[in-house]
């Protein structure tokens, strides 16, 4: 892909907000909003997220055309990330890849990207989740889609896309997170998938969630589960959310499984003396290249780091870096994901990553 300096020809969907009986907000919520707005010019952050989202649309358009069975996971990841870096005009911590490209296959739903030496090849029968992040000045456009090359799992993809669209529709200023989750669950569970003569209900993955997004922090603290719950927390004006849903033909519950590839420096990392010189050196590199943005082992390789696993595991053990293992449902099941980033402006819900594709 060639570099592009004009990113703002599309700005996603805008939906006018209607205010419900939940429209009264507590003093503490108003105070938090005032504090957020005091620290940033909204119009500038809007332009940053829109630029990131436009790059996302262009990168994924290319990816959807070119990803094919027979490619390695490393080829796919490099193509997406190199395209992102070129289009967003990567500039240190000012703009670049928002997080490692997720390429989770089949029963694995999230947090897989290839490490160096991974020779996994995409197969025709695979269900591939493609989760791409782009950031401009720390504002992360987080959006994902699922690809399949056989019609067997089309209904699974349809269910998850519909559930994500439901989550977006139900979101807005003062919407309660538990109620959004209930609507997502209801939509998802209205679908079923037939595989080799056996009918499977589509289940929302109960221990995965959408999330708020803060500057340079992909998981901002608020979570939108995919099953109904009693969370009375409200969405607030000025917030960004990744509305994402995952559906499964399996148990509808994931566990950590497989080799870790995803990491991030913790926002609340303790100040602890590091006894390993290699850990101190690696932490300096992480701070310089990623800050609190998620990264993977391939990104450390690209930054010139080598023989770093002992140091990296030490940083994890000290609570300075968080590791994120792959998240998988039972073997033999299939999972799908769709996701968009939304921005809650005072009178408009802007689906910044919306495109012609999804």
UniProtKB/Swiss-Prot annotation:
One of its GO terms (biological process) is proteolysis. A divalent metal cation 1 binds at residues 131, 142, 339. It is an enzyme of class 3 (hydrolase). It catalyses: Release of N-terminal amino acids, preferentially methionine, from peptides and arylamides. Its cofactor is Co(2+); Zn(2+); Mn(2+); Fe(2+). Signal peptide: none annotated. InterPro entries: Creatinase/aminopeptidase-like, Met_Aminopeptidase_Type2, Pept_M24, Pept_M24_MAP, Pept_M24A_MAP2, WH-like_DNA-bd_sf, WH_DNA-bd_sf. GO terms for cellular component: cytoplasm. It is found in: Cytoplasm. Disulfide bonds: none annotated. The keyword Hydrolase applies. Substrate binds at residues 111, 219. Binds 2 divalent metal cations per subunit. Has a high-affinity and a low affinity metal-binding site. The true nature of the physiological cofactor is under debate. The enzyme is active with cobalt, zinc, manganese or divalent iron ions. Most likely, methionine aminopeptidases function as mononuclear Fe(2+)-metalloproteases under physiological conditions, and the catalytically relevant metal-binding site has been assigned to the histidine-containing high-affinity site. Keywords: Aminopeptidase, Cytoplasm, Hydrolase, Metal-binding, Protease. The keyword Cytoplasm applies. Its EC number is 3.4.11.18. Belongs to the peptidase M24A family. Methionine aminopeptidase eukaryotic type 2 subfamily. HAMAP family: MetAP_2_euk. This is Methionine aminopeptidase 2.
